[in-house]
Every structure is written in C-alpha cells, then in structure tokens.
C-alpha cells in the first residue's frame, strides 16, 4: 500500500527570503526569476506584490537604518524591486476593467520621492479591476488638478512618506476636494493610525495597499464637503509660529550649525563633506519641528527624534549629540511658546533614548541623512540652504 504526500507550495515569507538575496546585491535577473517562480508556483499576484516585493522593500529600509546597507546599496535594491513590479505586471496582467468600473488616480505628494508604495497601490487596484492612472512621485498639485479635469476621475489615492510634506499634502487634498474629487490618503506621513489624515480633512485613510483597495471596493468615497476652508482645519496656525519657523528655516539651520561648532567639539574635526551632511540633518530637524507646529502634535517631533536616535546608535554615535542642536533652537525660538514646548518634549525624548537605549528602528519611516556621523552619507538630496521654505509657508492656510 502506498500513500501520496502532498507538499504545500512555499509561503510568501519563503519567497520573500528567496527574493532578498538577489535584491540585496542588486541582481535584477535573479530577482526577476524569483518573482516569476513565486507567481508560477501559485502565489497570487497581489501577494507577490505586497507580501514578497513589499516585504523585501521594508527589509531594505530596516537594513539601511541598522547600518548594514549603504545608501548606494539601498538605492540599487529599491531599483531592483521596482523592476520586479514590472516583471510581475507582464507575468500577471491586470484584470480588464468591467464596464462602468471607476477611475482612480494614484499619485505622490509633491516633494515625495518614495514612489514604490504608490506604485504598489496602483498595481493592486489594477488587479482588482479599476481603471488606474498612476502619476508617480512628486506630482505638483496644479498638474494633478489638471489631470482630474481631463479624466473625470472618481477618486484620488494620495501617498506620502515624508512628514514634512504634510502641509503640501493638505493643500493638495483640499484642491482635489474643491473640484469635487474625494481623496484617500496613506503612507507613513499621515501617522500609523491615520491621525493626520483626519486632521487635514482627507475623505478616507488606509494603512496599506490592501486596506486602500478594500475601502474603495466597499463603495464610493463620500463626496467632499463644499466650500472647505483649510484654515478651519488648523486654527492653531493663527499664532504664526509655523509660518515663522518655515520661512526662517535656512537661518535657523545656519544658526544651529554654527552653534554646534562650540557645543559639540567632535564637529570641529569634520571634513567639508561631513559638515555639509550635518547641515542637511539639521534641516531635517527644523523641518520636522515646523511640521509638528503645523499639526500641533508633539508626537510627530519626538517620534522623529527617537527614530533618529536609533539611526545614530546603529552607527556608534550617542543620541546626546542631538541635544546641543535642540538647545540652540530653543534659544533662537525663545519667543514662541508652542515651539519651545515641542523642543522641550524633544529634549526629553532624546534623553530617554540615551539613557534607555535607542528606539527600535521603524522601517516604514522615511530615511533622513546621518551627517552627524563622520563619514556617513545622507539619503536625502535636499539642500538646506535652498530657498524652498517660503513656498511651503505660502501654502499654509491663513
């Protein structure tokens, strides 16, 4: 008597582990073969997208944060994952939209360069039978609105990973609503619980691509409110603290930079390149302070500092290296009570990280630079001395 043993096909976690090896070394051909094999073995396309490619991309972020991948390696790995999405698109063509299927525009907030999350959302929606216009990263609001007028879209899915772009996201979603198109938002910028989506008046929020597709499948988003006034969402902005910090961003970065030369002695030995990276990191701190003022939420600022402390710890730099920068900022902003409150909370968060160990790295967060670390290269291409701050301030509700 013989028996037949049925061997279950590998699970998504197994395929993610197999994909990791070629992605980590930038091997596009082998990575593509793994994706084809996963789908060919019976794993549905949505799971390949989210539980294999998406899982590997989260690991890429975690490995960079833990200082096990360099910036160039992180960029190469992300590029391979982008290629894998395209490979799957050819292996598993999306469903043909049914007659009357809705049209969803998927776009990233202007200034948002993390484009892969939005692309995953777009591909999942295509697989589920929607007409999808994927506009990619860094979409200026006027161009998005023009596209809505031309296409008659039913909804916008707006993606944002960078918290400092929340004011721009607010202006963008309000502009979409003004032309009658509801907006679903998602991404780390809107908070792990969607708190900033609700604060800024988004019509819906989703924590991930599946949840976004499920929400849209349940029925149309509610029609946007008529005559929505942005300033009504954020009455605390009347104190002008956000506007001042944003418009003074370059000056504040310079002041903190020069203050650190006296208060953080290791910086005196930095090379010109290391000093440039430090200026970029200080710009991140000021940008997150301004955004915390915009949403009036200390958690945004303390969370960023705790995460930054973990990045520094992974590179052998004490979290206390952040304290002099916060002290100089407090001196410069002594006449701004909300800013002082945020800086005090941030100081306590850094001290807590220093005494109790750095916070666990959150791979879903956007990755700032690490210029306080000698020899480190920041991932951001932002120039802290470039005058873009005034534009963001002008987009704030009056």
Residue ranges and their predicted role:
Residues 231-246, 279, 304, 309-316, ...:
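Globin-like tetrapyrrole-binding proteins
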Residues 189-242, 383:
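Peripheral docking tails and interdomain loops at the edges
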Residues 78-104, 118, 153-155:
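Accessory recognition modules or surfaces
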Residues 99-134:
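Glycine-rich active-site/cofactor-binding loop and its immediate structural neighborhood
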Residues 126, 134, 138-196:
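Cofactor-cradling patches in redox/metallo enzymes
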Residues 1-91, 252-304, 308, 312-324, ...:
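Long amphipathic alpha-helical segments
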């Amino acid at each position: 008597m013989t028996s037949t043993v049925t061997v279950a096909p590998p699970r998504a976690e197994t395929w993610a582990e197999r994909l990791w090896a070629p992605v980590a070394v930038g091997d596009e051909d082998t990575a593509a073969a793994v994706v084809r094999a996963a789908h060919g073995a019976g794993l549905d396309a949505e799971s390949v997208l989210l539980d294999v490619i998406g899982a590997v991309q989260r690991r890429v972020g975690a490995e960079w944060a833990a200082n096990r991948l360099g910036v160039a390696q992180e960029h190469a790995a992300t590029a391979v994952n982008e290629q894998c999405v395209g490979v799957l698109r050819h292996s598993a063509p999306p469903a043909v939209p049914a007659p009357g299927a809705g049209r969803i525009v998927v776009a990233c907030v202007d200034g948002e360069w993390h484009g892969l999350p939005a692309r995953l959302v777009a591909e999942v929606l295509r697989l589920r039978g929607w007409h999808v216009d994927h506009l990619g990263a860094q979409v200026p609001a006027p161009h998005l609105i023009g596209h809505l007028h031309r296409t008659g879209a039913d909804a916008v899915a707006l993606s944002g990973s960078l918290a400092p772009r929340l004011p721009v996201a607010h202006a963008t979603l309000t502009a979409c609503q003004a032309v009658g198109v509801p907006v679903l938002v998602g991404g780390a910028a809107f908070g792990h619980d969607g708190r900033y989506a609700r604060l800024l008046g988004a019509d819906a929020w989703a924590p991930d691509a599946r949840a976004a597709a499920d929400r849209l499948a349940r029925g149309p988003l509610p029609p946007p409110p008529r005559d929505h006034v942005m300033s009504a969402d954020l009455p605390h902005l009347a104190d002008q603290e956000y506007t001042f910090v944003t418009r003074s961003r370059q000056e504040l970065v310079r002041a903190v930079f020069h203050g650190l030369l006296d208060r953080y002695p290791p910086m005196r030995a930095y090379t010109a390149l290391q000093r440039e990276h430090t200026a970029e990191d200080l710009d991140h701190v000021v940008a997150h302070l301004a955004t915390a003022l915009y949403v009036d939420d200390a958690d945004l600022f303390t969370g960023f500092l705790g995460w930054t402390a973990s990045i520094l710890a992974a590179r052998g730099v004490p979290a206390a290296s952040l304290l002099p920068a916060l002290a100089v900022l407090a001196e410069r902003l002594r006449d701004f009570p909300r800013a002082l409150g945020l800086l005090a909370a941030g100081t306590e968060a850094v001290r807590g990280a220093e005494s109790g160990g750095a916070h666990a790295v959150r791979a879903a967060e956007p990755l700032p630079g690490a210029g306080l670390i000698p020899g480190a290269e920041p991932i951001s291409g932002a120039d802290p001395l470039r005058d873009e701050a005034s534009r963001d301030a002008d987009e704030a509700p009056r």
